[in-house]
Amino acid sequence: MPLDNVQPKRLAKKNVVLFGEVLADIFPDQSVLGGAPFNVARHLQAFDLHPVMISRTGHDLLRDDLLREMDRLGMDTIGIQCDQNHPTGQVQVEMENGSHRFTILPDQAYDHIHAGIAHMITMSIKPEMVYFGTLAQRSMPSRLALDKFLSDSKCPHFFDINLRHPWYNKHTVRRSLMRSDIVKMNEDELEIVASYFKINAPTPLLKAKALLDQFELKYLLVTCGEHGAWLINQKNETYNTDPATQTQTIVDTVGAGDAFAAVIIIGLLHDWAMPVAMQRANQFAAAICGIRGGAPQQHEFYIPFKQAWNL
């Protein structure tokens, strides 16, 4: 490709700062790097945005693995703090009756994100969007760091709720919704959040509308797995996307929600019409379900989407 076709795209890279956990799923035979913010950041990097993770790891081999992988992917590591006293986040994965059982370990390095360092990174990056979830809010140090992070960033806030039992509560959800512009949740999470705020509307759409109005959100997106997704916006407009055509066998659904969120962020930053962004997000999430794990190992996976979407 001629250089003059590449250079404008490089200059137009948009900064997205993602706050939260980087962790490793520890299987009996291997470890796999993940965490929702990290998976979203990987996708944004592959689609030629400039994601910066604000997270914290231990001074250990998993940190070395993470930094090597981020370097391989061309990702910025400036926001990855190092903790001498706590390990890199881990999720223990065990096989039980033919399925996986996940245990998210407590008191990990990402529970101790340093607010001052996060502040310096955020102010230097000047993001066009920020992303956060609930898991990294389970401890006071990271919760305070997130509060400072959100106060620093004057751009839109994307809250990907990702409730992980037992690491969430009504207080965390309320505080997060109050600081958000765009919120993504699945249909089960919608029921949980609606119950927190005594919303007894008869349909999911009316529950979503009540949440959107109560917290003055711009968009509330609800994913429904194989049945697609829908949203409601501040103008009370609703959009639905049909189930994506599954062209390959479903291998697992790990990371499908992260893939969906990443493409919605891309769409918002590139001013795609929301029905287009929803359809593309659903299409990409379905493709992720056709591979093992939450993100592809090879960049070639992204090329057909970049070509189709003119990225």
Q: Where are these predicted regions, by residue range?
A:
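Substrate-binding N-lobe of the ribokinase-like
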Residues: 16, 25-91, 95-99, 106-111, ...
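Short, well-ordered alpha-helices that flank and scaffold nucleotide-derived cofactor binding pockets
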Residues: 42, 46, 68, 148-151, ...
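Ribokinase/PfkB-type carbohydrate-kinase core domain
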Residues: 2-17, 69-72, 77-80, 96-239, ...
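Short, flexible helix/strand-to-coil boundary loops that buttress conserved ligand/catalytic motifs
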Residues: 30, 194-197, 254
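A short acidic, helix-capping loop that chelates divalent metal ions and anchors anionic groups
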Residues: 26-27, 191-194, 297
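Short, glycine/acidic-enriched loop or turn micro-motifs at the edges of active sites
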Residues: 24, 59, 163-165, 189, ...
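Active-site beta-alpha turn of Rossmann-fold NAD(P)-dependent dehydrogenases/reductases
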Residues: 20
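Conserved phosphate-binding/catalytic region of the ribokinase-like
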Residues: 2-15, 201-311
